[in-house]
Amino acid sequence: MSTQGFLKPRSIEVEPVGPNHAKIVMEPFERGYGHTLGNALRRILLSSMTGYAPTEVQMTGVVHEYSTIPGVREDVVDILLNLKGVVFKLHNRDEVTLILRKNGSGLVLASDIELPHDVEIVNPEHPICNLTDAGKLEMQIKVEKGRGYVPGNVRALSEDRTHTIGRIILDASFSPVRRVSYAVESARVEQRTDLDKLVLDIETNGVISPEEAVRQSARILMDQISVFAALEGAGDSYEAPVRGTPQIDPVLLRPVDDLELTVRSANCLKAENIYYIGDLIQRTENELLKTPNLGRKSLNEIKEVLAARGLTLGMKLENWPPLGLERP
């Protein structure tokens, strides 16, 4: 079957919106292809982009993440949260262990981390903590290359290593894509007015540009669907890979705290044992409205935050919760 009759985009425009933020406009597409390709690219952009993140930390004098450090104003939990906001970029390596040492009063920044020549910090002014006059901070930070979002408890289960006292395993958000959404608008070519225009709105953390993110996601999509183009007649055999446990979208494994809801909304969800985004999207609007202290305003907030990630309430998930998912 020939595909020559299908329209392909003749125009691709990149409209910068801000630092690491752009709108990418493509047109024309056959009717319906805007949603087909836009949704596929959005899901790949959110879950499958390669990036870098701190995965383990060891601090001098710290046994566990609920400790405090004399002379440091923030507790260890806050330090770890701030550390997750540091954007690393590794060149020609998949992992590295970095050192941070700081003494005396002042603000500790990402730029205080000692870097080898092939490691870069995209946001060196990012704050990590504050020290008093007698303060002293020393830590080892392991940074790894990966995809999507991997909870620390899942990584701990998959690793066959002796647990070291003071070794803190972090939830790792590798994805360099912070936000992505798409819209489909009407397009026209000559007398045809039933065509689609696809608008991708992408913001990254600076490790890659929005344009490069789209290129990488398109390559992943092409690679995955190329197997279908290789299918031939019924008499020809095709050896499919052995299927294991169906993979869960890494976005669904993120805690609801990552949605940055108001404290009231977040507490209401946790009171109903909703700890992960995968828990939340399976609830319906009516179920959430029955939650004590969660009103229509909070519900609308939740719906808006989910919509920004291409998710909705009332979705059905198979094999949820995944094996090994820890409950607080």
UniProtKB/Swiss-Prot annotation:
SMART domains: RPOLD
Alphabetical UniProt keywords: DNA-directed RNA polymerase, Nucleotidyltransferase, Transcription, Transferase
Gene Ontology molecular function terms on file: DNA binding; DNA-directed RNA polymerase activity; protein dimerization activity
An example Gene Ontology CC term for this record: DNA-directed RNA polymerase complex
Pfam families listed in its UniProt record: RNA_pol_A_bac (PF01000), RNA_pol_A_CTD (PF03118), RNA_pol_L (PF01193)
Record InterPro entries: DNA-dir_RNA_pol_insert, DNA-dir_RNA_pol_RpoA/D/Rpb3, DNA-dir_RpoA, RBP11-like, RNAP_asu_C, RNApol_insert_sf
Record's function text: DNA-dependent RNA polymerase catalyzes the transcription of DNA into RNA using the four ribonucleoside triphosphates as substrates.
Subunit structure: Homodimer. The RNAP catalytic core consists of 2 alpha, 1 beta, 1 beta' and 1 omega subunit. When a sigma factor is associated with the core the holoenzyme is formed, which can initiate transcription.
Family, as annotated: Belongs to the RNA polymerase alpha chain family.
NCBIfam families the record matches: PRK05182.1-2 (NF003513), PRK05182.2-5 (NF003519), rpoA (TIGR02027)
Protein's name in the database: DNA-directed RNA polymerase subunit alpha
Species: Bordetella avium (strain 197N)
Lineage, broadest ranks: Bacteria, Pseudomonadati, Pseudomonadota, Betaproteobacteria, Burkholderiales
